[in-house]
C-alpha cells in the first residue's frame, strides 16, 4: 500500500478529536501497517511544561520491560581494569580510553550508545563535537555516565530509551515494534509514562500528561485515552 493510501486509511479510521483505548489505538495502527519492514510503534507525549524554561525541561531514560526489538551496539569509555572488564562482560562491543577515542576520531562511530565512567570523561570531553551532533555524548541524566558501566550496558541492551522535551514540550520515543503483542507495547508505554511522572518539574503547573498519541513509523498519530493505561 502506498504511503499516502496508508495515511488516508488510518485517517479514515480515526474520528477527529476522539481518544481511543490503548488496545483500539494499536489495532488501528497494526491493521494499517503494510510496510516491507517491521515498523516501530512510537509515542508522542505532550507535557504541561514550558520548554523555554530551563527548570521545566524534562530529560531522562527508561528501561522498557519488553525491550525495543532493536539490536544495540554499545561503546564504553572506562580505564583498564575491573570497570572495563565489567563492561565487556555485559556485552559492550568496544571498551577503551584514548585508544577508543582515536578509533572514533578515525571514523569508527558505528554505535547506538556511548557510555563512560566518570573518570573517563576527561577523554570523552574531547569528542564533544564528534559525539554531540550524533546524540551519542554520555550524560549522567540519561544514565550514560555511570560508575557502574556493566549495569549501564545491560540497560542499554535490554531496552533502555532516552527522551527529552522538544521546543514544544513534547517527548518522542519508541515503545517497540508492530510485531509486539499488545500487552508488551502497553507495559512499555506504562513504564515510560510512570518515569515521566517521576521526572515532573516542581515548577510545572496544571495537567502534566496532557496528550498521549501513538503512531507507526509511516503513519499519523492516534490519541490514547489515558484511563485505559491503568497508571498508578
From Swiss-Prot:
Q: Does the keyword Repressor apply?
A: yes
Keywords of the record, alphabetical order, are: Repressor, Ribonucleoprotein, Ribosomal protein, RNA-binding, rRNA-binding, Translation regulation, tRNA-binding
According to the record's subunit comment, the protein's assembly and interactions are: Part of the 50S ribosomal subunit.
Biological process (GO) annotations held by this record are:
regulation of translation; translation
Q: List cellular component terms (GO).
A: cytosolic large ribosomal subunit
What gene, per UniProt, encodes this protein? rplA
Record-stated family:
Belongs to the universal ribosomal protein uL1 family.
Q: Which Gene3D superfamilies match?
A: 3.30.190.20, 3.40.50.790
Pfam families linked: Ribosomal_L1
Where are the bilayer-spanning segments?
none
Organism field? Xanthomonas campestris pv. campestris (strain ATCC 33913 / DSM 3586 / NCPPB 528 / LMG 568 / P 25)
Q: Which GO terms describe its molecular function?
A: rRNA binding; structural constituent of ribosome; tRNA binding
Q: What does this protein do?
A: Binds directly to 23S rRNA. The L1 stalk is quite mobile in the ribosome, and is involved in E site tRNA release. Protein L1 is also a translational repressor protein, it controls the translation of the L11 operon by binding to its mRNA.
Would you tell me the protein name for this molecule?
Large ribosomal subunit protein uL1
Spell out the SUPFAM superfamilies in the cross-references: Ribosomal protein L1 (SSF56808)
Amino acid at each position: 500500500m502506498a504511503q499516502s493510501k496508508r495515511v488516508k486509511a488510518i485517517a479514515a479510521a480515526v474520528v477527529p478529536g476522539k481518544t481511543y483505548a490503548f488496545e483500539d489505538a494499536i489495532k488501528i495502527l497494526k491493521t494499517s501497517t503494510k510496510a516491507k519492514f517491521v515498523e516501530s510503534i512510537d509515542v508522542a507525549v505532550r507535557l504541561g511544561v514550558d520548554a523555554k524554561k530551563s527548570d521545566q525541561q524534562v530529560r531522562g531514560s527508561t528501561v522498557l520491560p519488553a525491550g525495543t526489538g532493536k539490536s544495540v551496539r554499545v561503546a564504553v569509555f572506562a580505564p583498564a581494569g575491573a570497570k572495563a572488564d565489567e563492561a565487556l562482560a555485559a556485552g559492550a562491543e568496544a571498551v577503551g580510553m584514548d585508544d577508543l577515542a582515536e578509533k572514533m576520531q578515525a571514523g569508527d562511530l558505528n554505535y547506538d550508545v556511548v557510555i563512560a565512567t566518570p573518570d573517563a570523561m576527561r577523554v570523552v570531553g574531547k569528542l564533544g563535537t564528534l559525539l554531540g551532533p550524533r546524540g551519542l555524548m554520555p550524560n549522567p541524566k540519561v544514565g550514560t555516565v555511570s560508575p557502574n558501566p556493566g549495569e549501564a550496558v545491560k540497560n542499554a541492551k535490554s531496552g533502555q530509551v532516552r527522551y527529552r522535551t522538544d521546543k514544544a514540550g513534547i517527548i518522542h520515543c519508541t515503545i517497540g515494534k508492530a510485531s509486539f503483542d499488545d500487552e508488551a507495547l502497553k507495559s512499555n508505554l506504562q513504564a515510560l509514562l510512570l518515569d515521566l511522572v517521576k521526572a515532573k518539574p516542581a515548577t510545572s503547573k496544571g495537567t502534566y500528561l496532557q496528550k498521549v498519541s501513538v503512531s507507526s513509523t509511516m503513519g499519523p498519530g492516534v490519541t490514547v485515552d489515558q484511563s485505559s493505561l491503568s497508571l498508578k
